[in-house]
Amino acid sequence: YDDLQKPLPNIFSDKDKNDYVKMNYDKISKGFTPAFIQQLECDIHPDHAWWNREPDSSNKDNEARCSAFLEMKGGVPDQFCLSFFSDILPPVVCNKYGPLGWIPTITLTTHIRKMPSTSVLYADFKASDINKGYFEQDCNIWDLDANLVASSRQLTRILKSEEKIS
């Protein structure tokens, strides 16, 4: 059986890939971008590049979401890359509330659906419920042939959330 398929989200085609923003935290603080991020071509949807916003801008209408094109050198990603990609993007709550400090993962489950057929992948991370600093972040990853190749869910905690969210 294979007639139920999760399609690429509409956000995939609402902006040109050239409008996406290279993930780079050095605007926040020089040297802040982790080395493992620098090994990855990661282009974030322009609506989700919270680190490029002015500090006084309102995040009220922003989604708790982060979408990106991902590519590592070496060709088509394997299952290890898919697992790595399932927790690679910034916490989605930063797009909604701005930088919040440490947001550790408590649990993470990744499902490898199939091996990708393209070297570039598209990831869409979203959260819909935040309660007392805890939230679940769902991720779906597609290859550019529109095959869902991996999905994940993680339970995450915003530390000192009452300072930023209440």
Predicted stretch roles:
Residues 1-166:
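Terminal targeting signals and extreme-terminal segments of soluble enzymes
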